């Protein structure tokens, strides 16, 4: 009898252990495969800046890190109100102008349209307004833009893109101002706003490698002995440019599809000479602006002061006219 009970207990224990083990395996499997089936937002564009510079996209020098990969300088504009009241929704407009008739080199070497993107660094406490706080008119201006915070605790740093440049040369950000009455760390005063705008692909990857949207130059001095075209199994195309030096050594430069070769076999080149054109038509630009978080009470007192000054001026004018009338009456008398 005891043996039967013992065997029953062991059987139940074994079943429980197997069930627990099965659940653990299923949980681990789901954990590792969920990132593949449902990619996290951090892996979406622009993950380069977020992964390489997780704390802030702005260097101590003031330079926004996007400029490390997008080497060409292009203009960027921003429009923000001069001052805003607490707990109000306003719009910040980032303008990224460029010639829409030009096309850039795609990753496969083909010609494609330019994409645009922007980063808006707001003061602490400012953030993208919730959906229910955005007026309908402003929603129409925003369109289908998705605003991505730079990090979990960085709601004041917002990233947008890539977006089709032909439709979004102006990106409208709906911003909610903080209320110092609810947050003691927020104070009234003047704050800085930092903006970066980009159009087109970068010339350098964060790893330091060149993209195919860049100029390629000779690695050695000599004569170009051979230019060969190679096609990969995936259909990718690249060119091998062999340079024979005076010592007889052959140095090979690999050029991906995209840049156009401007050299030919038998041509003498020096180290650093361009082998291709520069296909880049895009670029990055940044600028700073200022915004004042205004106290409504101060505005009220300012209006009252202005009204008092105007009233005093009116009284002075009336008094002056009264004196003139008295003087005129005395002269007539």
Swiss-Prot record:
Cofactor note: Binds 1 heme group covalently.
Biological process terms in GO annotation: photosynthesis
Membrane topology value: Single-pass membrane protein
PROSITE patterns, A to Z: CYTF
Matching SUPFAM superfamilies: Cytochrome f subunit of the cytochrome b6f complex, transmembrane anchor, Cytochrome f, large domain, Rudiment single hybrid motif
Compartmental location: Cellular thylakoid membrane
Listed GO MF terms: electron transfer activity; heme binding; iron ion binding
Keywords, alphabetical: Electron transport, Heme, Iron, Membrane, Metal-binding, Photosynthesis, Signal, Thylakoid, Transmembrane, Transmembrane helix, Transport
Binding positions (heme): 45, 66, 69-70
Function: Component of the cytochrome b6-f complex, which mediates electron transfer between photosystem II (PSII) and photosystem I (PSI), cyclic electron flow around PSI, and state transitions.
Name this protein carries in UniProt: Cytochrome f
The organism of origin for this protein: Trichormus variabilis (strain ATCC 29413 / PCC 7937) (Anabaena variabilis)
Highest classification ranks of the organism: Bacteria, Bacillati, Cyanobacteriota, Cyanophyceae, Nostocales
